[in-house]
Amino acid sequence: MDIAMAEKNTADIGFEKQIWNAACVLRGNLDASEYKSVVLGLIFLKYISDRFNDKYRELLAEGDGFEEDIDEYTSEGIFFVPVGARWSEIAAKAHTPEIGTVIDDAMRAIEKENKRLKDILPKNFARPELDKRRLGDVVDLFTNIQMIEHGSEKDILGRTYEYCLSMFAEQEGKRGGEFFTPSCVVRTLVEVLKPFKGRVYDPCCGSGGMFVQSAKFVENHSGNISNISIYGQDSNPTTWKMAQMNLAIRGIEPDLGTYAADTFLDDRHPTLRADYIMANPPFNLSDWGADKLKEDVRWQYGMPPAGNANFAWLQHMIYHLAPTGRIGMVLANGSLSSQSGGEGEIRKNIINADLVECIVAMPTQLFYTTQIPVSLWFINKQKKQPGKTLFIDARKMGTMVSRKLRELTDDDIKKISDTYEAFVDGTLEDVKGFCAVADTEEIEKQDYILAPGRYVGIEEQEDDGEPFEEKMDRLTSELSEMFAKSHELEDEIRRKLGAIGYEI
């Protein structure tokens, strides 16, 4: 999900890059959004084929003749791959002119046998723009993958899928990166919320990153992935399909609705009350259908402005919370202080309802797609510290991993989640410039503005032990030397200009 991915195994990262480089060769004259489905579709096809083959060999060895019995596979969550669609048959035709049609037919056959995949898999490999010789080379590369060398097959293909998603997001930039939330941002939300069991919901789920990280969290803490149930929605049909494939690779069975749909105008989970809601909605979405939703039951704290959906997203999520539910979401910083279109009043009402548990101001340059500064909002219907809100200023955190991109390190994420834990436990002490706890009265005095900088203050400078008088004597002496040096340089420049006939 991230270029320098969470839980990366340095021995394996070259493999992901190898796949990506092959994908770049495939691109030819396709644009990124088109070849995205080609590459991700191939990864998915290889994944389900390999899972099927493992089980097929196991059944063959048992010798009871059940290797073509679809129930033997579906009962273990394995997709059934019919004759004609198996990777060995695709590999055998890798360098024939009809390889694109062979893959398209395989995708159709797999969809037909597996209802969960209906209308989800890409079937555009036969198109003339796709170089069939290069496509055959990529099929060869996938055929020759030695999974044993690369650790768990599910993990390596899942990570490859995520790696390619991140690279597509970087390439597409503002035009197409909305489907992707950087891993370090998702992991921060997950590490604070700790979704061990219950219903997890993302109303704008993109490619499913929140769900993948939630499942990883459960697995990393020796939990059972079946203890969480996944609900999501996305309005973009291509992205919705990518999420379905991404989650299937991870062995996660989500309910993403029966089709891609607009969350505000066509809520696919109207009765859902979730235990954990995690989301990175589109920032400052302007045309969100406000005129059709004026009396909507979700706007408990005020009608969101037609020109900005930020508080529509927040209220939609609050509406879908279970009585003990919690939210972790990304919002543009404008939402911390905006007074326009009634946003100030909505924010005031949400604060006075004692729902805002924590605000984290995030560093810049975390996203491929925008330079808009963002914060994380954590909402809790049953706060352990009633009447209090934690403010964390994390703007100085993170490490630049490229000229344009910053990431939070594991230590950064741990520091944020540990600070939150200490606040919940009642053991947190304010740290100037980093974290502070404020009660509702203090927030009211600040006109209900939630910018952490207003509450955490300025970081204390370390005392270097040098007495003030001595420091001033030293600094003024150094300054005097610099002035003298500057006069010498000025005289030298005047002399040199005079020598060539230019007097100053």
Where are these regions (language model features)?
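Non-catalytic, mostly N-terminal accessory regions of nucleic-acid modification and defense proteins
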Residues: 1-196, 255-268, 361-364, 386-402, ...
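Conserved S-adenosyl-L-methionine
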Residues: 175-279, 284-288, 293-300, 312, ...
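Hydrophobic alpha-helix feature that most strongly marks membrane-spanning transmembrane helices
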Residues: 219, 248, 252, 282, ...
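Conserved Class I SAM-dependent methyltransferase catalytic core
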Residues: 18, 25, 34-47, 240, ...
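Active-site lining segments that contact anionic ligands and/or coordinate catalytic metals
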Residues: 273-274, 298, 308-310, 324-326, ...
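Short, contiguous acidic/charged loop-to-helix segments that flank catalytic cores in large enzymes
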Residues: 29, 288-308, 334-343, 363-369, ...
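C-terminal, active-site-flanking charged/polar segments
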Residues: 355-356, 366-418
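Hydrophobic alpha-helical scaffolding
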Residues: 128, 150, 204, 232-236, ...
